[in-house]
């Protein structure tokens, strides 16, 4: 009898392992291959060799990049150097990046590890750059003021909070206020492993301001990119491992109400909102397994989606760019400016194409 119970228990454990392994492979799109979609006049951005995980384009074409992210379990082509914030002018004929000096002596640059970024422009046209950083595997939001004439960033403040143990991306709604996607990737390797493997949906979205901090949405399988509609009425949230983008209605008290969900056959990463049309541009991982288990002989591909009329009954989803990793590995973000598409990656290069 004891032997029978033991064999039954072993069988149940093996079945559970097999089911979770299958689910894990499905959530990571382990077996999907890329169907190439090309764009004209694509050129690699000069000066980016260790990733452009996130980017923000200002109305005048100046563009911020976060680069050099050290991400647990993810490839790094420059592991010994701290991260940087880069600047590029998309109005130049052959744009190239330069590193922004960080002023103020209040930030430890040796442990600077920039991740998601977001900008806020106030009534005086002062530009604030909010940067998620992971010094020593923790999470902070670093607040900077952009000094355009000096081409530098003035560090103003470091934000930490117990509800923000492992921030992924942010959407600024003020100089020190933002929505943040929050997972367990940096918080604890043990939690991270279980969350990734079992799909425990532990991720959430937090609203932060100096006066109030609260969880405004939860139950996500790896909450990732986040963006806000042009009219400020809706918040878009990418659920990476569920292959979904959620649309939430934003209220005057900063709470969120779920409105609709779109599903895809790719892992959706950062979300950029078209400043003219309001369309969503999404950097995606067609095969997420290759991101977490890097092989130079079989590198992760890249994919960019454009979502038009997302609030309608029948949104239009277009694969604008797709590539098998020969040119661009591990796309995380895409944004547009005057007929150009700028594409960034978690650890590789960045690409600029004509639309």
Swiss-Prot record:
InterPro entries: 6-blade_b-propeller_TolB-like, Arylesterase, Paraoxonase1, Serum_paraoxonase/arylesterase. Keywords: Calcium, Disulfide bond, Glycoprotein, HDL, Hydrolase, Metal-binding, Secreted, Signal. Ca(2+) 2 binds at residues 54, 117, 169. Glycans are attached at residues 253, 270, 324. It is an enzyme of class 3 (hydrolase). The keyword Glycoprotein applies. It is found in: Secreted, Extracellular space. Ca(2+) 1 binds at residues 53, 168, 224, 269-270. It catalyses: a phenyl acetate + H2O = a phenol + acetate + H(+); An aryl dialkyl phosphate + H2O = dialkyl phosphate + an aryl alcohol; an N-acyl-L-homoserine lactone + H2O = an N-acyl-L-homoserine + H(+). PANTHER family: PARAOXONASE (PTHR11799), SERUM PARAOXONASE_ARYLESTERASE 1 (PTHR11799:SF16). This is Serum paraoxonase/arylesterase 1. The lineage of its organism: Eukaryota, Metazoa, Chordata, Craniata, Vertebrata. The gene is Pon1.
